[in-house]
């Protein structure tokens, strides 16, 4: 995990044997309101969050972004530079912006 940034308001769970490439961002919240009045004048206390779960044996490529509410299934691979906004199933290769399944991997017996 090199220069990876994990922002956690409520819950980020990273399983066993997970590899995170350099410069990844993992966040379980939107950080702040999009309304400038709320951010600047009223004080931003309404952070919306949803848990992030990265299951066992996942590989996340460099500079990928994993946003709130996402679960990445076990033994999946996320290509470098991907933006993960939806759940990714187990045993697949996924990538892109937004991240989509590219190929399913054969499961070992």
What are these regions (language model features)?
Residues 98-109:
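Short, basic/aromatic-enriched C-terminal tail that caps enzymatic domains
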Residues 69-99:
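C-terminal/domain-terminus segments
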């Amino acid at each position: 995990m090199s220069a990876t940034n994990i922002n956690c308001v409520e819950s980020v769970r990273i399983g066993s044997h997970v590899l995170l490439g350099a410069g990844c961002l993992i966040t379980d919240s939107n950080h702040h309101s999009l309304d400038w009045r709320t951010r600047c004048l009223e004080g931003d206390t309404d952070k919306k969050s949803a848990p992030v779960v990265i299951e066992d044996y996942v590989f996340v490529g460099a500079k990928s972004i994993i946003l709130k509410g996402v679960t990445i299934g076990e033994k999946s691979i996320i290509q470098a530079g991907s933006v993960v906004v939806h759940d990714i199933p187990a045993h697949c290769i996924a990538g892109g912006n937004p991240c989509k399944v590219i190929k399913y991997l054969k499961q070992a017996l």
